[in-house]
Every structure is written in structure tokens, then in C-alpha cells.
A protein has these predicted regions:
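Glycine-rich phosphate-binding loop signature in dinucleotide/nucleotide-binding domains
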Residues: 2-4, 100-102, 154-159
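N-terminal helical cap/lid subdomain that shapes the substrate entry/recognition surface
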Residues: 3-93, 100
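Conserved H-loop
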Residues: 68, 125-129
């Protein structure tokens, strides 16, 4: 009897990289642009402080500096910027090793453009099969629905499935209901 194929499905944010690094990348890009356009230096540190305090960063900087920008413009920029991100060495080695013997998939909630920019910046296309990457906006289902997991199970039948994520309240519910180790 042949051993079953292993399918390892990862979450993206705060599993393969720290999502705060995406936030810092976006804030850096915005701070640089605002400094160049409006002459306001050192805005990154302020933005990070406001974020850590739980304040609405975009509303705060717009009102504090009288910027002729809208929250919607800054939010769009945040979501669509091309981030500067890097996998840490241990994560890269793990993915390299696993990709030699397992099918690697990804299931992530979020906007397609944002998640795809993150994956490209991290170089994840080298490890993950394109048909095994599921983004909630693209498929119309979140990880709280069993549908994305069932889709991968249909694509890779007769396999053993593992799910790796960071949020037990969100990431593990459906995989556990379907009998996958998490």
C-alpha cells in the first residue's frame, strides 16, 4: 500500500511572516510620500505610536497636519502597496524541506491584491502550488466556512491534510471538524 500524499495548508498572516511587518512597510511608504509631497518629516514613528495606542492612524495624521488626503485614499494605498517583506531563514528552510515531499497550500482571509502582494514579496510562489492557494476574496468564502478546505480535499483526494495557522478561534475550526490535524 502506497503512503498517502501529505498536503500541508498554511495560513499567511502571522504564520509565515509577522503581519506587523506589512503594516510597517505600508506606513513607511506613506510616510515617505507624505514627507516628499508635504514636507512632514519623521511621520513613520508617529504613525506607529498612534497604531500602538489603538488610535485611527489615518484620521489622526490627516487632522493633525491638515493633509488634503482622505482616509479612503490612505486605506487604498495601505491595501494595495507593494510591500518590502522577507521570510525569515527558518521559515524559508522549512518550506523548502516540506515542498520536497508534500503539496503546500495556502488558505488566507483578506483582499486578493493585498495577499498576492505579500506572497510575491515573500517569494512564496517558489513553494506553493498555484492551484492550492485560496484567498477568501477570490473564492467568496472565509476560513470559517468548510468550503475552501473541501475544495482542496477534492483537488488532492486520498491525502492526509495538515493545517498550520496562528489563530485557534479562526484557523482551526473547519480543519478540525473535517478531521485534519492542526
Amino acid at each position: 500500500m502506497m503512503p498517502k500524499r501529505k498536503v500541508v495548508i498554511f495560513d499567511l498572516d502571522d504564520t509565515l511572516f509577522k503581519e506587523v511587518d506589512y503594516l510597517k512597510s505600508a506606513y513607511q511608504e506613506m510616510a515617505d510620500d507624505i514627507e516628499a509631497r508635504f514636507g512632514i518629516p519623521h511621520l513613520l514613528d508617529e504613525m506607529l505610536t498612534y497604531w500602538q495606542e489603538g488610535r485611527n492612524v489615518f484620521n489622526t495624521i490627516i487632522s493633525q497636519y491638515g493633509l488634503p488626503l482622505t482616509v479612503e485614499e490612505l486605506l487604498k494605498r495601505y491595501r494595495e502597496h507593494v510591500p518590502t517583506l522577507q521570510l525569515d531563514a527558518d521559515t524559508s528552510r522549512m518550506l523548502e524541506k516540506l515542498s520536497q515531499t508534500c503539496v503546500l497550500g495556502m488558505m488566507t482571509d483578506g483582499r486578493s491584491v493585498t495577499q498576492r502582494h505579500k506572497m510575491a514579496a515573500l517569494g512564496l510562489e517558489a513553494f506553493f502550488r498555484p492551484d492550492a492557494i485560496l484567498i477568501s476574496e477570490e473564492i467568496g468564502q472565509t476560513k470559517l466556512s468548510p468550503e475552501p478546505f473541501l475544495r482542496l480535499m477534492d483537488q488532492y483526494p486520498d491525502s492526509v491534510y495538515y493545517y498550520i495557522g496562528d489563530n485557534p478561534q479562526k484557523d482551526f475550526i473547519c480543519p478540525n471538524q473535517l478531521g485534519s490535524p492542526t
